[in-house]
């Protein structure tokens, strides 16, 4: 499976040859200049890193890769995405072992991961989504291993991986929160003080290292970047309608960077403006139940109704180092793309169906619910789901969260096979005998 995932990702990247664009272009252009000790992107006349200083985490990764690999850096970053996709698959298999402890469930997890093409197609995107998620999932794996054997070195492994995940993508704070919740729940049962130590180390390293990277760039460039666009503005944006009624809460710079810059980058004034907006919007949603239901239902559907989670879109809307071939063009806007989307639609429905069955079995069986790790995958998913329900929405953010359903779907499928095995075999035998009888009568 891991070799298959790597090779498929490698082939797709070699075929598409995409280049950075939009945010990834701004970030990696900065990385290129930082690599030659040119800090022009951090000067006051260049807004990007003043608006989004948290992006300096991935810029730091890009700078290191560019310093080492030079002109091949963009492909190496895609290679890291491919390895991240491999890492996600490996972590999900590990979770299947830790949580369900059944060979059939593990085997079905591996089988279903063979069909999960969305993260593989997403590897062309020069951004920290996959890398951050993979590193953070492994941080959770190490947390679970620590809780299982109480060996404290796994606390350090977890803290290092979650810190690296947050550096690559700030959304990894969602998994840091899940790690803290799991450790607190275990502490309430066991009263192990090492859990509190683990939380402190993870939080300090997870948040502190990213801030340290920003600080070192400020020192190198002799500037002060400030906090950037206040996070409250992203909540304001996530609660607003957009010009497209089918995409409420999607990215709209009017509520974030445009407002921030219109107030001369005054963080307090921008935040206060956002809070006033949020209060008005919440008041309106509370007073109109129909509008509230329609807004959040439409926002949820707009994120989850794309079975590919924009994994082809992130390639098709960006430039390429070379003219793409006929197959890639067909994937972008032809029959190959239609077939791929139809397959992804079936696969997504299949996973959701059996993940639902798996959750029903988990809720019914007390012995499974007692497993300390049973809440891990649902907790991460719920954190991501709620975050994007209220903040910025886009299907591409869910390409990683979707994979969390796979081990649960494998468990659900395994349980269904065991429960209905005899009935299914009996039905097949009955149909076979009936068919045989008809053929004999016709003779």
What kind of feature is each model-predicted range?
Residues 154-169, 179, 202-206, 383:
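Membrane-interface alpha helices of multi-pass inner-membrane proteins
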Residues 52, 56-60, 68-87, 341-345:
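Loop-to-helix entry region of an early transmembrane alpha helix in multi-pass inner-membrane enzymes
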Residues 121-132:
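Short acidic/glycine- and proline-prone juxtamembrane loop motifs at membrane-interface regions
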Residues 16-32, 36-65, 71-72, 270-274:
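Extracytoplasmic catalytic/substrate-binding loops of multi-pass membrane glycan-assembly enzymes
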Residues 40-41, 218-322:
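Membrane-proximal stem/loop segments at transmembrane-domain junctions that anchor or position
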Residues 92-115, 370-375:
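Transmembrane-helix signature of polytopic, membrane-embedded enzymes
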Residues 75-76, 80-81, 298-381:
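Membrane-interface anchor segments at the N-terminal boundary of transmembrane helices
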Residues 79-101, 138, 357:
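Transmembrane-helix motifs of polytopic, lipid-linked glycan transferases
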């Amino acid at each position: 499976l891991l070799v298959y995932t790597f090779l498929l990702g490698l082939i797709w990247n070699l075929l598409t040859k995409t280049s950075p664009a939009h945010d990834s272009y701004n970030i990696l252009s900065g990385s290129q200049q930082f690599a030659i000790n040119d800090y022009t992107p951090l000067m006051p006349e260049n807004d990007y890193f003043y608006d989004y200083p948290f992006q300096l985490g991935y810029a730091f990764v890009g700078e290191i890769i560019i310093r080492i690999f030079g002109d091949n850096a963009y492909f190496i970053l895609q290679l890291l995405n491919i390895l991240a996709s491999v890492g996600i698959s490996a972590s999900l298999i590990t979770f299947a072992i830790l949580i369900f402890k059944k060979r059939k469930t593990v085997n079905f997890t591996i089988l279903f991961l063979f069909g999960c093409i969305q993260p593989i197609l997403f590897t062309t995107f020069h951004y920290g989504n996959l890398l951050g998620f993979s590193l953070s999932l492994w941080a959770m794996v190490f947390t679970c291993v620590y809780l299982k054997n109480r060996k404290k070195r796994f606390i350090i492994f977890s803290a290092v991986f979650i810190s690296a995940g947050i550096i690559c993508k700030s959304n990894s704070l969602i998994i840091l929160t899940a790690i803290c919740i799991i450790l607190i729940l275990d502490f309430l049962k066991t009263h192990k003080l090492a859990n509190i130590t683990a939380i402190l180390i993870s939080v300090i390293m997870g948040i502190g290292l990213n801030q340290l990277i920003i600080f070192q760039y400020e020192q190198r460039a002799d500037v002060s970047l400030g906090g950037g666009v206040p996070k409250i503005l992203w909540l304001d944006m996530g609660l607003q309608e957009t010009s497209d009624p089918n995409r409420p809460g999607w990215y709209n710079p009017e509520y974030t960077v445009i407002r921030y810059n219109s107030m001369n980058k005054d963080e307090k004034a921008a935040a206060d403006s956002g809070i006033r907006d949020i209060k008005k919007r919440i008041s309106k949603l509370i007073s109109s139940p129909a509008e509230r239901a329609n807004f959040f239902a439409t926002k949820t559907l707009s994120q989850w109704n794309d079975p590919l989670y924009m994994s082809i879109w992130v390639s098709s809307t960006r430039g390429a180092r070379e003219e793409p071939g006929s197959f890639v063009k067909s994937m972008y806007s032809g029959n190959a793309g239609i077939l791929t989307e139809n397959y992804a639609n079936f696969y997504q429905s299949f996973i959701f169906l059996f993940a639902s069955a798996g959750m029903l079995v988990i809720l019914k069986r007390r012995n499974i619910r007692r497993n300390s790790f049973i809440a891990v995958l649902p907790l991460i998913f719920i954190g991501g789901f709620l975050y994007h329900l209220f903040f910025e929405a886009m299907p591409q953010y869910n390409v990683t969260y979707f994979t969390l359903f796979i081990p649960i779907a494998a468990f659900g499928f395994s349980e269904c096979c065991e429960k209905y095995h005899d009935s299914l075999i009996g039905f097949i035998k009955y149909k076979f005998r009936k068919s045989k009888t008809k053929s004999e009568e016709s003779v």
